[in-house]
Amino acid sequence: MASKVEKTHALPPCCSTESLISSIGLGIFCLVADRLLRFPIIQHNDWLRAISDNIVHGVIGMWSWAVVTGIRKKSDFGEVLLAGFLASVIDVDHFFQARSLSLQAALTLPRRPFLHCSTVIPIAVLSVKLAVHLFKLRDSWRFLPWMILVSWTSHHIRDGIRHGLWICPFGKTPPLPSSFYVISTLSLPHLCSFLMYLTGTRQTVSSKYGMRIDV
């Protein structure tokens, strides 16, 4: 009779009860957090609004990656924090575009900064994946392109409810419906997890640590 681990390997890991519950929680967080950010006390203070908005991006990035991988060991916490950092750090391009550390200048740009072009995401993902292969980095680094995909895509989708998606060189879409934002955000980790499962990335990373990541 097949062992429990072998049976689990045969199932898509993104379909476990725990990951489905976690992603529903993520969707609820998206709805609640964005409603809280509409409070006048936040909207009337540029610094508070910018920091709060960036924190929400970070939390969504962390939560999304936690759904992808599950948290089974201490190193997973480091990955989750890195995912949150990647989801938040995109906004630093506002200051680069403004060529100033002034928040007012960063918030009043004539056009969107370069990291907010959604075409950058597949370019960055493929570039990092190629670098991991060319430089023969450890198997434990094979998750990084997927983490960038999840973290940056979640950021772009959330920004899309206000500004639409900027897809160079084709222009931008209309603002995304809130329902699309929530459904896409809670579905994204499952899509990523399933693709990692199909490509063998999950098995490679988990075998490196002598265990299977169960999501």
UniProtKB/Swiss-Prot annotation:
One of its GO terms (cellular component) is membrane. The keyword Transmembrane applies. It is found in: Membrane. The chain crosses the membrane at residues 77-97, 114-134, 178-198. InterPro entries: TMEM267. The keyword Cell inner membrane does not apply. It is a multi-pass membrane protein. Keywords: Membrane, Transmembrane, Transmembrane helix. This is Transmembrane protein 267. It comes from Mus musculus (Mouse).
